C-alpha cells in the first residue's frame, strides 16, 4: 500500500529536478594557453609573470574570494553570456563555483584589459543604482579593484533585480587582456563574497526565480565549440548523465568542498590514504593538487617538462595509467585521453598534462581542485538546499 505514494514522491522529485529548467548555453573556445602556444608566446608569458610552471607552483591562501590563483583562468574554455542593466549590456563571463562575486569591466577602467573588452556604462542603464563601496580581488599579478553598483542582471531569461556587482576600474597583468571572457560570475557560497555582496544565485533563490535551489553543469568533450555544453539553473537534466547521481555532502560551506576517500593511479592507491579535501570548481580548467603530490603524479603518468609545462607523448595515451578519484565510496576514473589536453603546434600533435600544482595554504588547504578536466567526464549538480554535490558519468 505504501508503494504507490513512494513512487509518486519519486516521480515528483524527478519532475522537479528535470522540469522547470533554465539553461544557459556554454560555448567552448580555445584557451589562452592554446592561443599563446600557437603564437609561440607561451614561454614569454611565463617569463613576464615570473612563473616556471615546471619548477614553481602558485601559492594561494584562498581564505576568501579576495584571493584568486591567476593560473586558474589560463586554460578556461567554457563561457556564457549575461546582460546587465536596461536596456541590456551583454558580457561574456566564466561561471565560477570557487568565487561568489560578479564583476565586469567599468567604462571608467583604463587598464589595457578593459580596453579590449565591453565595458559597463551605468549612465546608459535606466535601472542602475550607485552603491559606491570599493572592492578588491587579489590575483597572481596584482589586484583587480573597482566599485560596487547595483542593477538588474539577466542570465538566459532569469532576471535578478537589485543585484550588486563589481565594476572593475583596474585589471592586472596580461591574462585578462587576451582572455575570451569579460568578467566572472561567482556561484560559490555567500561567505566567499568580497564586500558582503549577496551572490547572484542566492538572489535567484530569494526572488523565487528557480524551482529548486540547485544548479548543474554539463561540459561537452567536443573540442569544436563544445556543442551542448550548458549551465542549468533550478535542477538537473538526466539526459546528460548515465546511471544515478552519487550525492556527496559539502564538508565546508564556502567553496563546493567535498571529501576524497583516496586517489588511485593505475588501480593502486597513491594519494590521500586517509582521505583529503577537494573542491569541485567550474572556474578551474585543470585538476590541481599540492605541488609535491602533482610532481609524483606527473612522473607516474609519464609527463615530462616541455617549454615550461608538462606534456606526454601522444602515442602513449593507450598505455598510460588511469587516474581514479574515490569519492563517497564511488570510483571516478579518468583515462589518459580524459586527463590530457590535445593540441597542434606547427602541424604537430601536442598532448599537455591536465594536472597542475597549486599549494593552497591552511586553514583553507591543502586542497585538490576538480576542474573542467574532471567535470567534462562527470556531470555535476550543486545543491544549495541540501548542501551537497551530485556526480554521475557524463554522456558524451
From Swiss-Prot:
Coiled coil: none annotated. The keyword Signal applies. Its EC number is 3.4.23.34. One of its GO terms (biological process) is proteolysis. Residues 1-19 form the signal peptide. May have a role in immune function. Probably involved in the processing of antigenic peptides during MHC class II-mediated antigen presentation. May play a role in activation-induced lymphocyte depletion in the thymus, and in neuronal degeneration and glial cell activation in the brain. GO terms for cellular component: endosome. Glycans are attached at residue 90. InterPro entries: Aspartic_peptidase_A1, Aspartic_peptidase_AS, Aspartic_peptidase_N, PEPTIDASE_A1, Peptidase_aspartic_dom_sf. It catalyses: Similar to cathepsin D, but slightly broader specificity. Disulfide bonds join 109-114, 272-276, 314-351. It is found in: Endosome. It holds the Pfam family A1_Propeptide. The keyword Calcium does not apply. Homodimer; disulfide-linked. The active site is at residues 96, 281. It is an enzyme of class 3 (hydrolase). It comes from the Eukaryota. GO terms for molecular function: aspartic-type endopeptidase activity. This is Cathepsin E. Keywords: Aspartyl protease, Autocatalytic cleavage, Disulfide bond, Endosome, Glycoprotein, Hydrolase, Protease, Signal, Zymogen. Belongs to the peptidase A1 family. Glycosylated. The nature of the carbohydrate chain varies between cell types. Residues 78-392 form the Peptidase A1 domain. Residues 20-53 form a propeptide.
Amino acid at each position: 500500500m505504501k508503494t504507490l505514494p513512494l513512487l509518486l514522491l519519486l516521480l515528483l522529485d524527478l519532475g522537479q529536478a528535470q522540469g522547470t529548467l533554465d539553461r544557459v548555453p556554454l560555448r567552448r573556445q580555445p584557451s589562452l594557453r592554446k592561443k599563446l602556444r600557437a603564437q609561440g608566446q607561451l614561454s614569454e608569458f611565463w617569463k613576464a609573470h615570473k612563473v616556471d610552471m615546471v619548477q614553481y607552483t602558485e601559492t594561494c591562501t584562498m581564505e576568501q574570494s579576495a584571493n584568486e590563483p591567476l593560473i586558474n583562468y589560463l586554460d578556461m574554455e567554457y563561457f556564457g553570456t549575461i546582460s546587465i542593466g536596461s536596456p541590456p549590456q551583454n558580457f561574456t563571463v566564466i561561471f565560477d563555483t570557487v568565487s561568489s562575486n560578479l564583476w565586469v569591466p567599468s567604462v571608467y577602467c583604463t587598464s589595457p584589459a578593459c580596453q579590449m573588452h565591453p565595458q559597463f556604462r551605468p549612465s546608459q542603464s535606466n535601472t542602475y543604482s550607485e552603491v559606491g563601496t570599493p572592492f578588491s580581488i587579489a590575483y597572481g599579478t596584482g589586484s583587480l579593484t573597482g566599485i560596487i553598483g547595483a542593477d538588474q542582471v539577466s542570465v538566459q531569461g532569469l532576471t535578478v533585480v537589485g543585484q550588486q556587482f563589481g565594476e572593475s576600474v583596474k585589471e592586472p597583468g596580461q591574462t585578462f587582456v587576451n582572455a575570451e571572457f569579460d568578467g566572472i560570475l561567482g556561484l560559490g557560497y555567500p561567505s566567499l563574497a568580497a564586500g558582503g555582496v549577496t551572490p547572484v544565485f542566492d538572489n535567484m533563490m530569494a526572488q523565487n526565480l528557480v524551482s529548486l535551489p540547485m544548479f548543474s553543469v554539463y561540459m561537452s568533450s567536443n573540442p569544436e565549440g563544445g556543442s551542448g555544453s550548458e549551465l542549468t539553473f533550478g535542477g538537473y537534466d538526466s539526459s546528460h548523465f548515465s546511471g544515478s547521481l552519487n550525492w556527496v555532502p559539502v564538508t565546508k560551506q564556502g567553496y563546493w568542498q567535498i571529501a576524497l576517500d583516496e586517489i588511485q593511479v593505475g588501480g593502486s592507491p597513491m594519494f590521500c590514504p586517509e582521505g583529503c579535501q577537494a573542491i569541485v570548481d567550474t572556474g578551474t580548467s585543470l585538476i590541481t593538487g599540492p605541488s609535491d603530490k602533482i610532481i609524483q603524479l606527473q612522473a607516474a603518468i609519464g609527463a615530462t617538462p616541455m617549454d615550461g609545462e608538462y606534456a606526454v607523448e601522444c602515442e602513449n595515451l593507450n598505455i598510460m595509467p588511469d587516474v581514479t578519484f574515490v569519492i563517497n565510496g564511488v570510483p571516478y576514473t579518468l583515462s589518459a585521453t580524459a586527463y590530457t589536453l590535445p593540441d597542434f603546434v606547427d602541424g604537430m600533435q601536442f598532448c599537455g598534462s591536465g594536472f597542475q600544482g597549486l599549494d593552497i595554504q591552511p586553514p583553507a588547504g591543502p586542497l585538490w581542485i576538480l576542474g573542467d578536466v574532471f567535470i567534462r567526464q562527470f556531470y555535476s549538480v550543486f545543491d544549495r538546499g541540501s548542501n551537497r554535490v551530485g556526480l554521475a558519468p557524463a554522456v558524451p
